[in-house]
Swiss-Prot record:
Source organism: Rattus norvegicus (Rat)
Location(s) in or outside the cell: Nucleus
Keywords tagged on the record: Developmental protein, Differentiation, Nucleus, RNA-binding, Spermatogenesis
Disulfide bonds: none
The encoding gene: Adad1
The protein's name: Adenosine deaminase domain-containing protein 1
GO biological process terms, semicolon-separated: adenosine to inosine editing; RNA processing; spermatid development
Main location class: nucleus
Gene Ontology cellular-component annotations: cytoplasm; male germ cell nucleus; nucleolus
Residue ranges of every copy of the A to I editase domain listed in the record: 291-617
Start and end residues of each stretch annotated as Disordered: 28-47
PROSITE patterns membership: A_DEAMIN_EDITASE (PS50141), DS_RBD (PS50137)
Family: Belongs to the ADAD family.
Taxonomy of the source species: Eukaryota, Metazoa, Chordata, Craniata, Vertebrata
Amino acid sequence: MATAGGSRRAPVPGPRLGLPLAAHLPASLGGEGAKDSLGGEKTSGNNDWFQSSRVPSFAQMLKKNLPVQSSAQTVTLPTGYSSESCSLSNMASKVTQVTGNFPEPLLSKGLSSISNPVLPPKKIPKEFIMKYRRGEINPVSALHQFAQMQRVQLDLKETVTTGNVMGPYFAFCAVVDGIQYKTGLGQNKKESRSNAAKLALDELLQLDEPEPRALEPAGPPPIPAEPIVTPEAAYISKVQYEGRQVQYAKISQLVKETFSQLISSHSQYLKCSSSLAAFIIERGGHHEVVAIGTGEYNYSQCIKPNGRVLHDTHAVVTARRSLLRYFYRQLLLFYSKNPAMMEKSIFCTEPASNLLTLKQNINLYLYMNQLPKGSAQIKSQLRLNPHSISAFEANEELSLHVAVEGKIYLTVYCSADGVNRVNSMSSSDKLTRWEVLGVQGALLSHFIQPVYISSILVGDGNCNDTRGLEIAINQRVDDALTSKLPMFYLVNRPHISLVPTAYPLQINLDHKSLSLNWAQGDNSLEIVDGLSGKITESSPFKSGLSMASRLCKAAMLSRFNLLAKEAKTDDLLEARTYHAAKCLSGPYQEAKALLKAYLQQHGYGSWIVKSPCIEQFSM
């Protein structure tokens, strides 16, 4: 990973490499005024409050608020969750309807975190520093969280490389409270932004300076220094890439072996493997498949408000709901109070937090045998030839989509009748949502911190590259949104890679509406008819006479109530309905509202909300 040292107070030159997509699009796509991630005007580059001579300097406040490295005392997290000083109704009043004219370029430029001149800076929790050091928070998201806690303005600006750096490198630098930090280089913008954020954080958090340095005498500014990109560094990067690809290929093979074993007695469902999706847990270098799903359809009949119908049976959605069942089992292990069983759980406590978190060195992978429906299947010419695209085409490809009986439509065309028929958002859009809110959902957010996907692996059976998936997941939502999200939430950036496909793609005419699901601990597969949302007669697993799937909302509420009893959180049991239990998860609901507002204000369309009566049931 190439980085560079530079002057902290040098002027920031204009961009040299990699013009943004907005530079090639019609003027109608960009809009006149630059907006922040919630639709307001961007603030200026300087923060007058922090520059005032009557208040402490940023460096003084930072030194005061950083935890003392040598002290063993516990630093508590803030008791409340930060929120913007605007109501949801105010957000709605600023929403721009999708008309083909976007209020901002589709691939958003870096947005500045807005400093607050009224509220005092927060203390930097030791847990935040530890998580960053362990690599659990990517540098860009961590820097935005830091800026939010310190109430300072942040901007990641593209700059230039000097003549002694050979090759097509991009350069970015972080500007925090008007101070420019060292320049980060990379072979793409994502890598260079990450390197720049890391350089700034390492200095701001004093990670490279265990002992404070004496103040240096005033003098001329230091000479900027760019890194020397050596052949050895390039070789190490290549070795790391090849090693990672070998690991990913083994994961794909592991998924194939697991699914083949599950259907060994049900070979008639082999063709369902074309849509296969699976979640894999890595623990201490060992990988195990913990959740599997297949399917390409969703429920399309009339609303049934009993919670016993499965609405979306697309593979990645089914696999994720199976993953939730795995999480519930792991949490029951933790709350068993049996030391041996607690040791087996993937969850553990974290100091100064009442929410559990994944144990150290545990990572979550997602394998998909094919690209998910929606924006991830963006046309290659749209992303490779920006000069030739039209505003309408860009709008259509990158906007939010809704799934209806296996087909994909723009949400802007979704009628009121469509909403009553229980349509679901596309799998691509749900992946985008999980990369901000986590995969755990609202109910489990009462017990655990957000769980994010570390890597997404896509089978190469019908996919030549993953750029469409990169855009759908990693570029529709800007890192700056992290600074507005509640504690523990962030804009996650999973690594996306092509891997050898686990199964070849096959046309499945006989069982095209069927969906298979399994989670670690299940004795057998469950088979659901995606069109009816119920278990089939031929399913190896059956729940009872109602034929309700073990993945339905009612089943999840039953597990939630059981977990609440084991965790002795009696207040959660007071929720009278499934909907009420979800609404009690305040930080999760706040993050969800911010994400929906962000997507709508940036021209991607409205997130379709199902009828409220679907969740108004109780056990």
